[in-house]
A protein has these predicted regions:
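Clamp-loader machinery-focused feature within the broader ASCE/P-loop NTPase space
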Residues: 5-9, 13-123
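Charged, glycine-rich active-site and insertion segments that engage polyanionic ligands
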Residues: 5-9, 13-43, 49-61, 137-139, ...
Length: 265
């Protein structure tokens, strides 16, 4: 989806013997890191044999594969990576290190996918290091991050990095058409908007927020509304504070670009 077919095929075509036990996928929120990560994980569990037993695929699709562990939390502490308590699914006693030390159940390999690994604190990152430094031959750790260089350098040194670049306007529009979005295009959203961000905005009825903001700023600059009206309208836009700051930065970039090229807004 957000990732290019070439990038996905490049990763999956890697020979199994040369595949590193640690992979970090870097890219903006909404660019498709999870899709790429799960595609790699799925192929590892299938041992890169698409004709392998169908039960692996069914279990993976249902997120119930016993040799796949997805860690996707808002905060990742040391207990999520390594804990003293015995692994216990019912009590929620689960951690990455224990999972990887257990023998594979039905696959030849075990895979952990850590979403937003940049949310790991230092203690959690240090706890993960041993699994990266001395991996079992069947264990693989895939991580995604939204920010470059957000992890300790020692982790990066033991992993292969895959960087997913943002799509161009043309590529984004092509992607939107493929998923059935024809009423909007990339120019209706800020330049930093990624495919799944755009889709979320459309589905959550926030697709006009950016255009409303640009019209508001344009009216204010040309004195069509006064400061108090502008502040009220700005406050009423239904996005969070960080989103509004990002819109402001985007608008300033547009102003700067127009000044540099001597174009009208």
């Amino acid at each position: 989806h957000g990732t290019s077919r070439r990038q996905r095929q490049m990763c999956i075509r890697d020979s199994f013997e040369n595949l590193p036990h640690g992979i970090i996928i870097n890219g903006s929120t909404g660019i498709g890191k999870k899709i790429l990560a799960k595609e790699i994980a799925n192929n590892i569990l299938l041992n890169f044999d698409k004709d392998n037993n169908l039960k692996h695929q069914v279990l993976f699709d249902k997120n119930t594969h016993p040799d796949f562990y997805l860690l996707d939390k808002d905060k990742i502490g040391v207990n999520d990576i390594s804990r003293r308590d015995k692994w216990d699914e019912e009590k929620g006693f689960r951690d990455v290190v224990t999972f990887l030390t257990m023998t594979p159940s039905i696959s030849k390999n075990k895979v952990v996918l850590i979403m937003n690994a940049d949310l790991m604190n230092n203690a959690a990152q240090n706890a993960l290091l041993k699994s990266l430094e001395e991996p079992a031959p069947y264990s693989y750790i895939i991580m995604t991050t939204n920010r470059p260089k957000a992890l300790n350098q020692t982790i990066y040194s033991r992993c292969r990095q895959i960087n997913i670049n943002n799509l161009s306007v043309i590529e984004t529009n092509h992607w939107l058409e493929k998923v059935g979005v024809t009423d909007y295009n990339a120019m209706d959203f800020p330049s930093f908007a990624t495919p799944f961000n755009i889709l979320d905005d459309i589905q959550n009825d926030n697709h006009n927020s950016y255009k409303e903001f640009i019209l508001l700023m344009n009216d204010f600059m040309f004195s069509k509304i006064d400061q108090s009206q502008a502040i009220k309208l700005f406050t009423d836009i239904d996005i969070n504070f960080i989103g509004k700051i990002n819109f402001l930065v985007e608008f300033l970039k547009i102003i700067l670009a127009s000044k540099l090229t001597d174009n009208q807004l």
